[in-house]
């Protein structure tokens, strides 16, 4: 079927509920698929929309009681007339008119008239709406059942915090790796990746096939630094690392322990005791607490003995982490900042230390200090109206552990998400349980990319606050279990279901070919 082939005509609809399209007899309903694009030719403008449902209808209910069973000729005569197929189309954009000539496709504010012809969207239509691949736009894949490139403006993406969601095994890691490569290629931002399963630094795994694929350091050796918490594991995997991370006890703050309350099974009283110890002993509170053996000291601190024993068990869990030392040999935050300030991207691999305690502690501790540095630099840049820091995207996995309703208001990650791009720092969060993330945080995400989700709660959470939620629910529910995703939000003019581009067999289009961004462009990006 030609891409310009007429599919049918508009028969009913509304702006809020969508448009009903009656298929022509020549158009096979089996060729129609939820998530595909169509254009509607109105009298004054064209409308660009997405198929959100496919159905069958009849003009005479008697046909459903006495269908022409076994009579191919009669079936052919009735199909398209008395019996027909219908499409439900959600209109998103208008193309044409004086506004479009100046500003491009516009959000839809009206609907086409009765009997307006409906066609499949062409490659030219997709390029008009989403743009062509260039020095700013990055090719992320293809719209469902189309060969045209779907491109994303990564500088626009990096201006807000974003999320990648999907149940286990649907391709979240692949999509994350692809977006990180895009941010590198287009120099849209620098990345700090807290890499729980060592997928983004030197090499990753090809989901579903088990084989290794190149990750950021191999593709961009001069632009990526790999930090590791587990030097032995990195050497065994043949990874070229730039820094071995050690965390000193004096770097641990009460906020870090508070975030670990559930993980360490701490009581509220035990968390409050941490703040009391910090006030009394200062930065050396952790070591001082380890040395407390008598009840008199606890009485002086107004800490109950059972509370202290609960806290000590949690502290012992942290103390046993191999990368925790009494005195760190160097300042890891200063080292990370030096790389970021020079335009290099940092991937922190956790190696064998994939326990959630280690991940939450390290990610929160480092992010808090890095954010403070970016805040100071941005405030100075605003005062001087120059020298803005390069936008920083911080990537975290298992995001619901940092951003659930119980802790989101207290963590640095919640602060970053709520402030959007105020201090040149945004988040890229990856999670298979979006329902576990605080509603306010979800509402602050600029762009969401979601693979297949099973739970109704997760689907509702990822689509919360989105116009046309029910229609997108149908699209999301029909995605394949692998290699299909739905993207919507700030960085795209309208939702689009797509197949991500191929990665892992040929790296010719993925390597070190990024154009550099000037200081003026960086300043413009954050104004």
Regions found by a protein language model. Give the residues of each.
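Conserved P-loop NTPase motor module
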Residues: 482-527
